[in-house]
Amino acid sequence: MEHHNSHLLPGGSEKMYYIAHQQPMLRNEDDNYQEGYFIRPDPASLIYNTTALPADDEGSNYGYGSTTTLSGLQFETYNITVMMNFSCDDYDLLSEDMWSSAYFKIIVYMLYIPIFIFALIGNGTVCYIVYSTPRMRTVTNYFIASLAIGDILMSFFCVPSSFISLFILNYWPFGLALCHFVNYSQAVSVLVSAYTLVAISIDRYIAIMWPLKPRITKRYATFIIAGVWFIALATALPIPIVSGLDIPMSPWHTKCEKYICREMWPSRTQEYYYTLSLFALQFVVPLGVLIFTYARITIRVWAKRPPGEAETNRDQRMARSKRKMVKMMLTVVIVFTCCWLPFNILQLLLNDEEFAHWDPLPYVWFAFHWLAMSHCCYNPIIYCYMNARFRSGFVQLMHRMPGLRRWCCLRSVGDRMNATSGTGPALPLNRMNTSTTYISARRKPRATSLRANPLSCGETSPLR
């Protein structure tokens, strides 16, 4: 293969030889070219088709590990073996490789676009339910709405920009301003989620461990939420400062002047200590608080009453309600930890040069990146599944949409017809109480308006 758009190698050769990774060491004995050296990226960086970036203590480094670039990756020199053609209009350097194939890009679209859609719709619905329903405006639901806003920030800015720039285009097309903002918003969103979960656990801890103490008011909860966002914004502030656009040392990026968005720290030491500090603030400290509070809450809520102590029906209902809320929030905490902890541990391990040369690293990085991005669409599913009031709010909102309301109406009518004709499942029989027949006959008949039934085909009353 001849290189039509050639660069000059340091040795003066008029041809550019580029490593085709994950392919045999190809060489035509009849070719007359100068043997040279080219900087080959380690396997993880091959996702991005970059080659060499400074890795010394004074050079710029990748940094914290935002989702818009592959951070902390090390590189090694390799003999030049394969000569590749490329042009700025048709970038096909790695057409034989999985990462640049059309099938892989289809998989990327199928994995990331549903996250973007479901996260925006689900978290937007959560915010709307809390805002529009008076009885849903509780302290815990205010914190849940704050979580949803953070997930909307992640899904709207970070999810599409990261997968488009990393896996589809292989460069950053969104400009310098969005480079700063996207890296910043990703860190802020994770910090807001961690700190808000801590605030919820402390609120539940106080309410259950000391039930006679004054509860956190809604006004005080808004101040706590504002404080959470302020601390998150301040903690992540170094990230937009060191973020910027840079041309990696690859033939195509250099020739076509294609930039990537990455963090460029003054020294590797600063980057390492900030990454370590951010990991502690995002996960180590919050996870310690969450384990302590929910362990104490679990012991208190699921503990049996002492023998001889009376328990009324009201006490049983309150205990069941507390257990449901604790189960839901524990699920939220576990899902958050499972989604984001692997990706952040991977960013720390990339500081180890030997680990950065691990062959399966590109696949592990891709899987952990998708897992972290997918977190923003899980919380609404948890709320809908484990909380009856959120579930009722979701159902009522669906019935207000014309298309969904008609579909639900046709389905419910079909179910009733099947039940009456005997083709569907039989409805339970209700026994008539003859002793109250005379009294029931004098009462006004129950209203049969569709408005009274939240699952009917007509308009539904708002959730109160």
UniProtKB/Swiss-Prot annotation:
Origin superkingdom: Eukaryota
Principal localization?
Answer: membrane
Keyword flag Membrane: yes
- Which parts pass through the membrane? 106-126, 149-169, 190-210, 222-242, 275-295, 330-350, 364-384
Show the GO MF annotations.
neuropeptide receptor activity; neuropeptide Y receptor activity; peptide receptor activity
Q: Which organism is it from?
A: Drosophila melanogaster
Query: Which SUPFAM superfamilies does the entry link to?
Result: Family A G protein-coupled receptor-like
- Give the PANTHER family listed for this entry: G-PROTEIN COUPLED RECEPTOR (PTHR24238), RYAMIDE RECEPTOR (PTHR24238:SF73)
| Its biological purpose | Receptor for the neuropeptides RYamide-1 and RYamide-2. The activity of this receptor is mediated by G proteins which activate a phosphatidyl-inositol-calcium second messenger system. RYamide signaling may suppress feeding behavior.
Instruction: Supply the gene name.
Output: RYa-R
Pfam families the UniProt entry points to: 7tm_1
UniProt name for this protein: RYamide receptor
Tell me what topology the record assigns in the membrane: Multi-pass membrane protein
Look up the record and give one Gene Ontology term from the biological process aspect: G protein-coupled receptor signaling pathway
Q: Is NAD among the key words of this record?
A: no
